Amino acid sequence: MSSTTLTDDQIRDNERTEVLAKATAAKNIVPDIAVLGTGPKNAILRAAADELVARSAEIIEANASDIEAGRANGMEESMIDRLALDESRIEGIAGGLRQVAGLTDPVGEVLRGHVMENGIQMKQVRVPLGVMGMVYEARPNVTVDAFALALKSGNVAFVRGSSTAVHSNTKLVEILQDVLERFELPRETVQLLPCQTRGSVQDLITARGLVDVVIPRGGAGLINAVVTGATVPTIETGTGNCHFYIDAEAKLGQAIAMVINGKTRRCSVCNATETALLDAALSDSDKLAVVQALQEAGVTIHGRVAELEAFGATDVVEATETDWDSEYLSFDIAVAVVDGVDGALAHIAKYSTKHTEAIATQNIETAQRFADRVDAAAVMINASTAYTDGEQYGMGAEIGISTQKLHARGPMALPELTSTKWILQGTGQIRP
């Protein structure tokens, strides 16, 4: 072995040292970034958008290295799609930066307040969280999203992408840091963590006192590893095993269109429909129409073959238990027949990731029962699951879809990346 070759332990030690040094640098600039004015923040975001477009050739070249390595390592095409950047997607990322610049700055917003009987004026205001760690997989656009939303909400971004996107992420962060430097702000306002080993994730999520919150975004394995292993507070952006229940009183053509949209519009995202539940009270011809429409759209059907063949379906892949709780992220869908809305609710309760659940029905009482009883961050009544999206909600860009119940639930936009503090202003009052 060459004298310059590092052992695995030395690589980990160096990585740990780098993470803690970067975390310390991030923590040190929190007070200054927290009070940065709205005008400068917006100017930086717009300049960053222009710079990304101007240097798109550099980004695409770096991204090509990641895609080449991904294909060589057998990466699935659904993940290649998440990884890929071209001029159109870079324009979209730049547009996202400009959009965030146009959003209302949440920092300093007064949520409530009053004057106490003794004359003390009190108010609750929004304040940044501090150092915001992001751990995510093969989507380099998240790097820029994290920077934009962190900066606008007064936070410092500490990002750790997948090793599969290391060239893309390195180039994107370099460009963002160049823009920050132009505005005389620390390059540490956004930093990329090393990803030579998975140990850097553990270093990040246990950096209590340096990192204020960690938000994982990706597959179930990544999210569970972060949430269960962290000592730093986390916000869980869950996987999306989204169900669409078609009630016997649904408008069938409308329901079919919504299921196909939810499944095929972009199958590699977390709001894609992964399971279609068919009311047993639907006629055999209606059930068959749903299955055939999906197949004609290029979707592979997984289900209990005997159950689906009973109403005439063909070319069905026998489902295993795994199919019912899978986030396919591909042109695959699980299909099951259930006993009415309560059967749908029971199935969803067993397999849901509590992301988005949908119902198609013209019965108001059935719709209300579904909405009241299903446990999910978002409930769609006669609408595609694809609408679970911060931009669609009118919230602007989001950092992810939170499926937990504390701090934030659903699309996490700027207000969800803040906390609050109470400010009391008196004139010398003392408490008796």
From Swiss-Prot:
Biological-process GO terms, alphabetical: L-proline biosynthetic process
Q: PROSITE patterns annotated for this entry?
A: PROA
> Per the UniProt record, which residue ranges are transmembrane?
none
Domain of life of the source: Bacteria
The protein's matches in Gene3D superfamilies, at most eight in alphabetical order, are given as: Aldehyde Dehydrogenase, Chain A, domain 1, Aldehyde Dehydrogenase, Chain A, domain 2
Q: What is the similarity comment for this entry?
A: Belongs to the gamma-glutamyl phosphate reductase family.
* Name this polypeptide is given: Gamma-glutamyl phosphate reductase
**Classification of source organism:** Bacteria, Bacillati, Actinomycetota, Actinomycetes, Mycobacteriales
